[in-house]
Amino acid sequence: MAWIVEQPKSQKELADRFRQLMKEEAILQIPGAHDAMAALVAKKAGFSALYLSGDAYTASRGLPDLGIVTSTEVADRAKDLVRATNLPVLVDIDTGFGGVLNVARTAQEMLEANVAAVQIEDQQLPKKCGHLNGKQLVSKEEMEQKIQAIKKVAPTLVIVARTDARANEGLNGAIERANVYIEAGADAIFPEALQSAEEFRLVAENVSAPLLANMTEFGKTPLMTAGGLQNAGFQMVIYPVTSLRVAAKAYERIFQLIKDEGTQEAGIEDMQTRKELYETISYDDFEALDKNIAKTVLGE
């Protein structure tokens, strides 16, 4: 991991970098990385920040996104991503894992993990994926208190306030909540499950804060390009579960191939080579730490 062979950035440095990226002219594309390997591949592709999705993280644990995991578990995974990449990470902390005191504890745990930014939503527990039916919301006042709690105990954390009100209170309700959350101290707004390009434009016209779009697949929101979202007035876009979906489908294919043919040979071309793997995880840098380790030479 990068923190062993590189000088790790502090939480404040990472948070300041995230704030800078939010303000740049080009929209900030933030891919979801459910583990450190995915994070390293995303960094290699040239991304400047990463997203840890609650949905993707829980799925990687073999669990549904129903508020089952704990703040400590999520912070541990977030720490893996930060240590591996030295990039600012935006972490989905769901509802904050409980009431105001739970939110304060969660914020402290994210600070200790060197997380740059957190995303907190206004659903009630047990929460659900934002693109499913049956979501229930907390009051605006309760969400305000949660945002204020993060500000108080972790003032360097960037706060992205997510509202799921589009499904329950309509677009105007989502806009109203967004503006309340900004007044409470949110640094950016994530309006979940918008249903058209026009809705993205209307939110941008009525909310004066950096805006984050969710380009998740198979949901209520139509897929739009980064350029289209930027033109609509959004500053950030996440792809929360994309890499996990692709990886899971690759698992299905290779496991079925081995089961059917008794060998993986026909799938070799789809694999990362040993050399590519070692480059991704900075194998040589680790080896160089210990002069007593014989230099590994890979064949072509």
UniProtKB/Swiss-Prot annotation:
One record GO biological process: propionate catabolic process, 2-methylcitrate cycle
Task of the protein: Involved in the methylcitric acid cycle. Catalyzes the cleavage of 2-methylisocitrate to yield pyruvate and succinate.
E.C. designation(s): 4.1.3.-
InterPro entries assigned to the protein according to its UniProt record, in alphabetical order: ICL/PEPM, Isocitrate_lyase_ph_CS, PrpB, Pyrv/PenolPyrv_kinase-like_dom, Pyrv_kinase-like_dom_sf
CDD domains: ICL_PEPM
Reaction(s) catalysed by this chain's protein: 3-hydroxybutane-1,2,3-tricarboxylate = pyruvate + succinate
Entry keywords, A to Z: Lyase, Magnesium, Metal-binding
Protein name: 2-methylisocitrate lyase
Homology family: Belongs to the isocitrate lyase/PEP mutase superfamily. Methylisocitrate lyase family.
Residues annotated as binding Mg(2+): 92, 94
Broad enzyme group: lyase
Molecular-function annotations in GO: metal ion binding; methylisocitrate lyase activity
Species the sequence originates in: Halalkalibacterium halodurans (strain ATCC BAA-125 / DSM 18197 / FERM 7344 / JCM 9153 / C-125) (Bacillus halodurans)
Sites where the protein binds substrate: 53-55, 129-130, 162, 192, 214-216, 245, 274
SUPFAM superfamilies recorded: Phosphoenolpyruvate/pyruvate domain
Top-level lineage group: Bacteria
RNA-binding found in the keyword field: no
This protein's encoding gene: mmgF
Cofactor: Mg(2+)
